């Protein structure tokens, strides 16, 4: 009986080994490169390089393709891009929902981030603008946030132009006396915040979490009216303004991805990252000057116990 049991265990082990070998032998299912989009903020750079690194670990050819938050969608729908780690659903433009409905873009799931977006300002601005954090206070003290180029209106730093016009749309909709000025890039926006803080100068800016800056500096968020429905920036009114629709961060692939690269699809569907993961990575890159590829490779090396389960 012991010999039979041992034989059964050996046979079972052999089947498991041969099964893993068969799986490994079938990957990559195609030698065509998986084209992964990289965009223009550090957190997305990190999630992109983690996904790309894991795909390479599995044996896939990977090509990184530059796009942005809006232009990625037609590129994914046409198959010129195959995978995006971060689609922020409140900043997708007019095409995205229709392309998803048609099946040209496939939503794999959420990445795992808990995002927040809105206007931030340093706490010392509450002395210069009594009534903050309530957004209505900004109507009375816009000049406190003004500059030579915007006076008597306040100066509002918004997202870079390629990220959409949500702040501009809302300012126009609720007739707030601010001049929206697009930030040049994430790095330029962070530099402006740090410069303003060091001199206690006025600043108000559209920003987002996760981001390392909230672990290093104090900021308050402008508060808006709660809403039970969808918060649409361009159709708000002064008395009932709800601010900004908060995002889900979705992982998406091109049509036919699962059929062409099934093991890659399985891994990507299981892949998750947290705010803590991205905050730590952004700090290493933006503050310590490390290369994002190096930081992503380090995360992969230190977290095999996590990502190995995504591939099994």
Listing of model-derived features with the role each one plays in the protein:
Residues 104-159:
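A conserved helix-loop-strand patch within extracytoplasmic ligand-binding domains
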Residues 116-128, 246-260, 283-284:
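A bilobed periplasmic-binding-protein/Venus flytrap-type ligand-binding module shared by bacterial periplasmic
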Residues 29-43, 60-65, 153-157, 268:
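Short, well-ordered beta-strand elements
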Residues 23-35, 146-153, 306-312:
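Immediate post-signal peptide segment of exported/extracytoplasmic ligand-binding proteins
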Residues 39-42, 60-77, 181-192:
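Short helix-initiation/N-cap motifs at beta->coil->alpha
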Residues 42-61, 171:
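Short, polar/charged alpha-helical segment
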């Amino acid at each position: 009986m012991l010999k039979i049991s041992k034989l059964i265990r050996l046979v079972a082990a052999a089947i498991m080994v041969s099964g893993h070998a068969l799986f490994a032998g079938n990957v990559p299912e195609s030698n065509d490169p998986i084209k992964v989009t990289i965009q223009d903020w550090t957190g997305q750079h990190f999630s992109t390089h983690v996904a790309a690194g894991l795909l390479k670990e599995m044996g896939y050819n990977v090509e990184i393709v530059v796009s942005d938050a809006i232009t990625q969608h037609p590129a994914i729908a046409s198959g010129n891009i195959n995978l995006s780690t971060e689609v922020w659903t409140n900043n997708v433009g007019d095409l995205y929902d229709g392309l998803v409905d048609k099946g040209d873009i496939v939503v794999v799931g959420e990445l795992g981030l808990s995002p927040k977006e809105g206007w931030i300002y340093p706490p010392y601005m509450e002395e210069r603008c009594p009534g903050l954090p309530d957004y209505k206070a900004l109507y009375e003290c816009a000049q406190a946030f003004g500059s030579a180029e915007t006076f008597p209106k306040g100066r509002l730093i918004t997202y870079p132009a390629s990220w959409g016009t949500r702040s501009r749309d809302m300012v126009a909709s609720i007739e707030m006396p601010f001049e929206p000025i697009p930030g040049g890039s994430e790095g330029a926006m962070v530099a402006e915040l740090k410069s303003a803080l060091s001199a206690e100068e006025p600043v108000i800016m559209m920003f987002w979490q996760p981001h390392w800056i909230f672990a290093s500096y104090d900021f308050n968020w402008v508060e808006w009216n709660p809403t039970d429905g969808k918060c649409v920036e361009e159709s708000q009114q002064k008395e009932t303004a709800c601010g900004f629709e908060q995002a889900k961060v979705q992982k998406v692939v091109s049509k036919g991805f699962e059929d062409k690269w099934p093991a890659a699809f399985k891994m990507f569907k299981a892949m998750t990252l947290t705010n803590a993961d991205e905050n730590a990575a952004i700090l290493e890159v933006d503050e310590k000057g490390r290369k994002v590829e190096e930081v992503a490779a380090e995360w992969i090396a230190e977290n095999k116990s996590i990502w190995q389960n995504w591939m099994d």
